[in-house]
A protein has these predicted regions:
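Short, charged/polar, Gly/Pro-enriched secondary-structure boundary elements
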Residues: 80-85
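Amphipathic alpha-helical dimerization/coiled-coil segments
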Residues: 87-109
Length: 109
């Protein structure tokens, strides 16, 4: 990562940071969902910011309305799919490292 990005706050977007906070607040509420007003209170931001964040998350397939109550929102399966992909890739990398370690250990004998 670039040193400039590590040290320069000019690259930090308040809107992106708010949206990431919204994702964090929504996590764990997939069954019952959360209303925009609850979300605004917990994320400590305005209802307008929540409306904007939810619209962007929905557009990216990261959030969806609760099927049983369309006034409530939840995180969409796409985020779980991304997390599963990361987990799978890390597991594959770990297996490859274990295989490499075993192969190099055999060479030392």
């Amino acid at each position: 990562m670039s040193t400039a990005i590590n040290n320069d706050s000019q690259y930090i977007s308040e809107q992106v940071q708010r949206t990431l906070k919204v994702i964090s607040v929504m996590a764990g509420r997939e069954a019952q969902g959360i209303s925009p007003s609850e979300l605004a209170k917990l994320a400590q931001t305005s209802p307008a910011n929540i409306t904007r964040a939810l619209a962007n998350l929905k557009q990216a397939s990261f959030a969806e309305r609760l099927p049983s109550d369309t006034s409530r929102w939840r995180l969409a399966p796409k985020l779980v799919q991304i997390a599963n992909s990361v987990s799978l890739n890390l597991n594959q990398a770990q297996l490859q490292l274990q295989q490499d370690q075993q192969n190099y250990s055999l060479l030392a004998i």
